Amino acid sequence: MSARESFNPESYELDKSFRLTRFTELKGTGCKVPQDVLQKLLESLQENHFQEDEQFLGAVMPRLGIGMDTCVIPLRHGGLSLVQTTDYIYPIVDDPYMMGRIACANVLSDLYAMGVTECDNMLMLLGVSNKMTDRERDKVMPLIIQGFKDAAEEAGTSVTGGQTVLNPWIVLGGVATTVCQPNEFIMPDNAVPGDVLVLTKPLGTQVAVAVHQWLDIPEKWNKIKLVVTQEDVELAYQEAMMNMARLNRTAAGLMHTFNAHAATDITGFGILGHAQNLAKQQRNEVSFVIHNLPVLAKMAAVSKACGNMFGLMHGTCPETSGGLLICLPREQAARFCAEIKSPKYGEGHQAWIIGIVEKGNRTARIIDKPRIIEVAPQVATQNVNPTPGATS
């Protein structure tokens, strides 16, 4: 997917001050309930999970615990399993078309974390803000829907239904469903000591979109202008937007090629939170140790200048439609990282070895002084495409 021209509201007969992100108070997957609260809220669901059919299901495969975003349900006939996920987010960027693509990629990412590359069907869930004018609704929502549809088509699937409601905030999400044979998905519970951890997208999207909004807020911009330029912020924002809209499908396919043992996608709990969730699911007594943090260029410096208010260096900064965190055999990891950059997969994208799996007690941590890998933006070298439907 090529880089895009900046969204211009006036091209759609909207006021030049229109901002999609003003129709929510939370951004992206930053809407997630805190992990500790979530665990308590869902305890009763975990206790009753498959209780009525435990004998049948338990004999087929281990169940996934709370904190993992995909359900795997063995079907009663044919040796097949239903793999399904649902997710929704709030607007995080101001380009409606790209926001639709990001929302779709975010839903699909949970399937990709299971190594599933084919999605049989998608539903779209939309909350249309009752604070929008009729013109804003009629101009903006079709762009969001088109972006969602285009991303689904890129994934080889289609949107066949869903639900649309009025809501104070804009809500964007969906359901992704597929039926798989056992060899078409990878249960996220087989990490072994000696594996390495690979990440397929850089961190820092939440920082990039936040500071991009600060360009219009002098009191906030003044806090960071000594460590970052306006051009740096614009590039980081564009890079974040392209990364969030990029499907994790290629990485999902390569998980099979290079014998991945477990994976999860990085979203609202940050890299540490999702690493901890994944560690809890492991059959073996292992722990994950993260040594390296690949971060969008200049966003680590911005985070530090803000007193680390984003939690980026601590691994708690939310990501939206982030990369896959994959446990790979040590001898396969470098080959995985080389292969995912190959032009055969389109533009090719980086992946990074960021840590190790060692014997432990099913926990995850980031070392005290992780190495920050500054990830230079690729958007500056890509072709620019206009937004669909814009008038000149």
From Swiss-Prot:
Instruction: Give residue numbers for the site Important for catalytic activity.
Output: K32
Q: Does the keyword Membrane apply?
A: yes
Checking Gene3D superfamilies in the record gives:
PurM-like C-terminal domain (3.90.650.10), PurM-like, N-terminal domain (3.30.1330.10)
Query: Which co-factor is required?
Result: Mg(2+)
CC per GO annotation: cytoplasm; nuclear membrane; plasma membrane
Where Mg(2+) binds, per the record, is at: D69, D110, D265
Q: Which UniProt keywords apply?
A: Acetylation, ATP-binding, Cell membrane, Kinase, Magnesium, Membrane, Metal-binding, Nucleotide-binding, Nucleus, Selenium, Transferase
Where is the PTM N-acetylserine found along the chain? S2
- Known InterPro entries for this protein? PurM-like_C_dom (IPR010918), PurM-like_C_sf (IPR036676), PurM-like_N (IPR016188), PurM-like_N_sf (IPR036921), SPS/SelD (IPR004536)
Cellular compartment(s): Cell membrane; Nucleus membrane
Q: PANTHER family recorded for this chain?
A: SELENIDE, WATER DIKINASE (PTHR10256), SELENIDE, WATER DIKINASE 1 (PTHR10256:SF2)
Member of which family? Belongs to the selenophosphate synthase 1 family. Class II subfamily.
* Stated role: Synthesizes selenophosphate from selenide and ATP.
The name under which this protein is listed is: Selenide, water dikinase 1
Species, as recorded: Bos taurus
Per the record, the gene is: SEPHS1
